Regions:
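Intrinsically disordered, low-complexity regions enriched in acidic/Ser/Thr/Pro/Gln residues
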Residues: 2-173, 178-179
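Surface-exposed beta-strand edges and their flanking turn/coil or helix-capping segments
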Residues: 57-59, 65-70, 107-110, 131, ...
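Alpha-helix initiation and capping sites
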Residues: 162, 183-186
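Feature captures the catalytic cores and cofactor-binding loops of soluble hydro-lyases/lyases
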Residues: 185-271
């Protein structure tokens, strides 16, 4: 099992179902055994309607499915979920709510994002996101940014074992508490979103860290979760920065060692 207690979850590097060993050669023509990530297809149904099939790591299918539906506005935080059923043999998950659902129109209106494996945003999410304003007065101390990166790099992870994955982490002050990985960064953030929703975690006093780029997709998902501070070791896109400024999200990128760049929400940073 992954290391877990109340509101704490980290990667399980001992789960053999997530990796496999493949024989190969190194640069000197020596035979080696390489550990690689297992990627699978997860099909998500909402009530009786098939929504999407995601290529992903199948470690937390329920969190991924719920987070995906939340971030696509297909379920709301006030909706009552009647049941969640996962068929491990078919890699199929069915989420049932009390609402009647018909997403024919919303599924036709989609934007292919810059996310790994072609993330998709449905409906009017881009139009709606500008109406959200993050009002949290949480602060992040200058020294925490370096401490957060250092602590995350020391946590045993699938990335350190095999590479080929992105990571997303929820931070409480300067302490990592929830760490999700996946082959696509949008999947990793959806897992975070689903976990926080199902465990009723307050986002207003948390910090979000991602290994991925700070694109519009990543900013939108962070804002939808109402998390006030987003950090990445990677860089920014112009649309991502624009959305962060409109929604009052603190946006910190290129956080490597003791260096970083902040392009939005400067008031939450304390030196």
């Amino acid at each position: 099992m992954a290391r877990q207690n109340k509101h704490s979850l980290f990667p399980n590097i001992y789960n053999d179902s997530l990796t496999q060993n493949i024989e190969g050669l190194d640069q000197d023509n020596n035979r080696i055994s390489a550990k690689i990530i297992k990627e699978g297809a997860l099909t998500i149904f909402l009530n009786k309607q098939e929504i999407v099939t995601l290529m992903c790591i199948l470690d937390h299918p329920i969190y991924l499915a719920i987070g995906y539906l939340l971030n696509q506005n297909m379920i709301g935080k006030k909706d009552k979920i009647r049941s969640i059923d996962f068929d491990k043999d078919l890699n199929l998950i069915v989420v049932r709510t009390n609402k009647k659902t018909n997403y024919e129109k919303i599924l036709k209106k989609k934007v292919i994002t810059s996310g790994c494996a072609q993330g998709t945003v449905f409906g009017n999410i881009y139009e709606e996101i500008g109406k959200i304003k993050i009002t949290s007065k949480i602060i992040i101390r200058h020294e925490w940014i370096y401490e957060i990166s250092k602590k995350i790099n020391q946590i045993p992870s699938l990335y350190l074992e095999a590479g080929a994955v992105h990571g997303c982490v929820i931070i409480n002050k300067n302490k990592p508490i929830i760490y999700m990985e996946d082959v696509g960064r949008h999947n990793a953030v959806d897992k975070i979103s689903g976990y926080m929703f199902l465990n009723n975690i307050n986002p207003g006093n948390k910090i979000f860290y991602t290994t991925g780029r700070l694109t519009s997709e990543m900013i939108i998902k962070t804002v939808k979760m109402k998390i006030p501070i987003l950090i990445s070791r990677s860089g920014f896109t112009s649309w991502g920065v624009e959305i962060a400024k409109k929604t009052n999200l603190t946006l910190i990128g290129r956080a490597k060692g003791k260096r970083y760049t902040i392009l939005s929400g400067h008031k939450r940073l304390k030196y």
